[in-house]
Amino acid sequence: MSSIESFKQEGRVFDSPVDFVNNAAISGMEAYRALCAEAADDYEGFWARLAQQNLHWTKPFTKKLDESNAPFYKWFEDGELNVSWNCLDRHLHNGNADKVAIIFEADDGNVTRITYKELHERVCKFANGLKSLSINKGDRVIIYMPMSIDGIAAMQACARIGATHSVVFGGFSAKSLHERIIDAGAVAVLTADYQVRGGKNLPLKAIVDEALAMGGCDTIRNVVVYKRTGGAVDFVERRDIWLHELVEQRTSECAPEPVGAEHPLFILYTSGSTGKPKGVQHSSAGYLLWAMLTMKWVFDIKPNDVYWCTADIGWVTGHTYVTYGPLAVGATQIVFEGVPMYPNAGRFWEMVQKHKVSIFYTAPTAIRSLIKAAEADPSTHPSKYDLSSLRLLGSVGEPINPEAWMWYYKNIGGERCPIVDTFWQTETGGHVISPLPGATPMVPGSCTLPLPGIIAAVVDDGGHDLPNGKGGLLVIKRPWPAMIRNIWNDPERFEKSYFPHELGGRTYLAGDGAIRNEETGYFTITGRIDDVLNISGHRMGTAEIESALVANPMVAEAAVVGKPDETTGESICAFVVLKRVRPEGDEAKQIAKELRDWVAKEIGPIAKPKEIRFGDNLPKTRSGKIMRRLLRVLAKDEDITQDISTLENPAILEQLKQAQ
């Protein structure tokens, strides 16, 4: 791939407040550079020091990094520990037993608080219940549960006994669940009768039954069911058991099972691509270390913070920054069952006000949706709520366009909260490129600089470094402790996907394009490699065109894809959601012309969309991610044959198909 061209440079720079910087875990750029220099001088020693200081080991490690079978790297492999002990028991010994671990808000607004001592007891009972079903160290367990204290406890219980969990997002279909059960060779499924989202009871147990009825799931011995609503469900005798019955007679003590540092803590299947799902396999020690360090460095977590990451446990963000990271550092966190638009679009801000949230971490898609909602219904505008408890904001899941960044900064953060625009992936285990809120000057739309110990670069197809200002492939040149260890049952695919021979077989290929600012070296993610457009020989990232569209005052949200074009090779097709009612006919044509001219002015004529389609919304997963693969099919005017079970709003496809 030749370099990606970037036509617009963001010039705005924002510094964190002085008092924030003075009290930050990493205070000032000199402190950041000192950590980077330590990693450069003694890479293995840098990570070993951090692992010794942050993790509790039942058997200390003597080995640091093993690269003998690259790219199947190993860290601290002769050490042993238990992840659950590091998340729970440590707080019973350091004076935080009675500190609130989780503030759970149900869909209907009911609130439950649970301390570290109480959560420890619940996890131990759960773990003892799993052991009574002969679930042992190394067994795989599927978790298909809603956002809940019990969903988090299920993951921690697996970690406590050394079972490898694989959480499947509650929005996935029976077919998707079936594929994952078979690939993982799971012995049990942990689920709920229903999940409650946006005032609706959605079946989970019935979907599990449907998946198991498809056949081939011979490894499954038990289905454990958390009674969320008490609604009717079918029960298979001897296979199915209620969670409350499984745990009611169990002791609240369960000795944590020591596991090797490289023991698979979890498998998480990546969604969205065609073909067999990829089971991303993560280690225990290296993964947990990075979850802790990024909580401290990127979120600057303090003992009195109230932290809220809005992600579902079915996604990697809900693993690292809900189930593991916050608990390992002893944080008090919000866990929310519902959705941002129910009962109205002020729900998030009402919760920030009610719980005095100080750190808030959400996705750009949610931010853009809430911008549109606030303009449509001023009563839900964040200015109507007291958000003064906030001190730090975060963005995750996709690049945040500068205009959404600015709205977030002004309206949610009151121009006083740093924003950490975090770039990372399921495969990286945690943040890899992100501002440090006490050190890094912020630029809207840029994830800024790699974290200490992450050796990121922008290269061409042959792996050669590109100069700043030239876009190319984002890579990480050295193995880091939290990185993906394998694709479950598919090592060949692991090597081919992430460590291609073209790059030497040892360099991690992120699958994203990036460009570095000529002066600061800041990274901007230009989108997935397969989201790069080639217009008349010019390679352009979709993210830049989308940002230009969203910068227009009329536009709430935009997604851009390429479609074949006889003249230019590829042309730009934009799907746009306005802040007002969807236009039709001549009005739609007029607004489309205005937007094309706008993009030409913002970026250049080469970036003008040839086609613009207007919709009431964009096709999104239930976690809020835009399903661009479906937009590519719509742009080509082809019929959709892919699995759309994770699509939140299927009706939008027909609207966008006809909106030409």
Curated annotation (Swiss-Prot):
The keyword Cytoplasm does not apply. One of its GO terms (biological process) is acetyl-CoA biosynthetic process from acetate. One of its GO terms (cellular component) is cytosol. Transmembrane segments: none annotated. Mg(2+) binds at residues 550, 555. Keywords: Acetylation, ATP-binding, Ligase, Magnesium, Metal-binding, Nucleotide-binding. Its cofactor is Mg(2+). Its EC number is 6.2.1.1. It comes from the Bacteria. CoA binds at residues 197-200, 317, 536. ATP binds at residues 397-399, 421-426, 512, 528, 539. It is an enzyme of class 6 (ligase). The modification N6-acetyllysine is found at residue 625. Acetylated. Deacetylation by the SIR2-homolog deacetylase activates the enzyme. It catalyses: acetate + ATP + CoA = acetyl-CoA + AMP + diphosphate. Belongs to the ATP-dependent AMP-binding enzyme family. Catalyzes the conversion of acetate into acetyl-CoA (AcCoA), an essential intermediate at the junction of anabolic and catabolic pathways. AcsA undergoes a two-step reaction. In the first half reaction, AcsA combines acetate with ATP to form acetyl-adenylate (AcAMP) intermediate. In the second half reaction, it can then transfer the acetyl group from AcAMP to the sulfhydryl group of CoA, forming the product AcCoA. This is Acetyl-coenzyme A synthetase. It comes from Herminiimonas arsenicoxydans.
